[in-house]
Amino acid sequence: MSKPKYYITTAIAYTSGKPHIGNTYEAVLADAIARYKRQQGYDVFFQTGTDEHGQKIELKAEEAGVTSKEFVDNVSGQIKSIWDLMNTSYDKFIRTTDEDHEKQVQKIFKKMYAKGDIYKGEYEGMYCTPCESFFTESQLVDGKCPDCGRPCVPAKEEAYFFKMSKYADRLIEHIKTHPEFIQPESRKNEMMNNFLLPGLQDLCVSRTSFKWGIPVDFDPKHVVYVWLDALTNYITGIGYDCDGDNSELFNKMWPADLHLIGKDIIRFHTIYWPIFLMSLDLPLPKQVFGHPWLLQGDGKMSKSKGNVIYADELVDFFGVDAVRYFVLHEMPFDNDGVITWELMVERMNSELANTLGNLVNRTISMSNKYFGGVVENKGVTEPVDDDLKSFILSVPAKVDAKMEKLRVADAITEVFTIFKRCNKYIDETMPWALAKDESKQDRLATVLYNLVEGICIGTTLLGSFMPDTTKRILGQLNASERTLEDLKTFGLYPSGNKVTDKPEILFARMDIKEVMEKVNELHPPKEEPKEEKPEEKVVDIEAKPEITFDDFAKLQFQVGEVIACEAVKKSKKLLCSQVKIGSQVRQIVSGIKAYYTPEEMVGKKVMVVTNLKPAKLAGILSEGMILCAEDAEGNVCVVSPEKICRQDLKSADFDRKRPSDIAGI
């Protein structure tokens, strides 16, 4: 019987510079998913690579005093070496400067032109060089790029355009009938409400103002727009041929099962890419997942901000698997995660050194101390053993359920419950006490056998996330690798096996002070220019009549997520938000248009008064209130919880306004 196929891709990394840990996270995440699918028995093809054309790269190469090709060769090599360092098990590393890719892109452009989907015209508007994106004046936010926030420059040039509107209705229908296509759901709502439903404009797909790109073969003064070039890597990398001579690999693997990308480029992958595929008469990918960002304490990592942490530096301090564990475990499903050196040390000590490393070391050491390393199941059981076994055997299904939904961080948490339960089992059975009683030797042997078996099961599940650690643990236990199917049974470790007599420390505890001293030597802190602090203004709040606690307790506060938002027509102050609270979605109208764009609101966690009587604002029903605060200058900001502990909040401490006050009506 042939294995089911699974084709997973990352967004190809842009070759503008050395990748930081935020860029690297995506490759590690894709690798964990690919490894788990292989464990499940899938025939996996995992593709990653580098995006190497565009005006930004041409300018960077000029600054460096090298040719564009020399520049991308160097950076692509850096990216590949980092992916290899992080133990990513990709099957194909594609470069958009590969000759076969470039030829197919030219053919694809020509085919779309011949079909009438591409036509020649003149482009006039705004262009963001870092994002390689075109915008109209109305799409800019305060005159800047809506994606990255950098300044845009006017652009006017002859160009080819793609008729996006031709396929818009078909794409909308596809998204409606395939709810799994764009994930998480908040990203889908953003694409539908902000781009597709308002109507698509034709897309500029060529440039003449720079040369570093793939020439349009029938009009060589034009180069192909970088996103048309880059997106097609997903098909050219597995052997797509525009003339119909597709490779066996393409016929087997397409459509892709998962495009894993950053949330900042989801528009290109869920609007442009599927429309390009429709033009080529190819099936659409099954799912596009826009993962959140890994932030460095004070925001998104950026070389210009000077807050970058690099993967190879982290590996030098902590090791590959510790870094893999951190980035996979600390990234929520749909919220940004945070990485700092201090957090890395904390996780290293508490979870890797204590929970996992100490468990393995203690178990092996006790096996050597009491039985010369021989691990035997003597069958002397107690009720606590049954509890341990049933708990451990319940975990694989939980991990599988989490991985099916791409909740990788939650899956790792489930795996570590096995190691925590084994540590608890040591406290419950007290092997050191059993060792003092000659009559309890068989019971002691059984306890140690159960520990070794539990570690083997947990370690097998750990293999997708920390592959080297898995090999090291199994090697020390003298245990063979298992399949996920094997994990349905407790007791497969061969009784009488002998563990190593020289246990190695898997993860050493680290001193935060020493680590930070070395980090500061590596990256000396920048001296911030001293600024005179403006005199703080004390805001006089108009006294309101006192209320009793019982009055306050009547209010119900819940945390929700804004999944869609739009400006209220004919209102200068109102935004209408769709807020997901638990399993329900509420419509809430707020007078915050002067402070937030609809795009900024989408994805925000907000606090909502949910038992407020529904009211109409500007003729639109509002089913609650989003809580806000106001500073001395009258600026309003949404109250956003740092994290969600639970949906219902018993109390809160903030200043609130009536709907009519904040709406200004």
Question: Where are the language model's segments positioned?
Answer:
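A glycine-rich helix N-cap at a beta->alpha junction
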Residues: 76-91
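Intrinsic disorder at enzyme termini
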Residues: 473-551
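Helix-rich, typically C-terminal accessory recognition domains appended to large enzymatic cores
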Residues: 120, 343-380, 391-499, 609
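Beta-strand segments within the central parallel beta-sheet cores of soluble alpha/beta enzyme folds
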Residues: 287-290, 474-476, 576
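Phosphate-backbone binding interfaces of nucleic-acid-interacting proteins
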Residues: 530-665
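Cys/His-rich short segments
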Residues: 115-168, 172
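Structured secondary-structure scaffolds
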Residues: 2-48, 100-104, 148, 154-369, ...
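N-terminal catalytic cores of NTP/NDP-binding nucleotidyl/phosphoryl-transfer enzymes
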Residues: 2-75, 94-109, 114, 131, ...
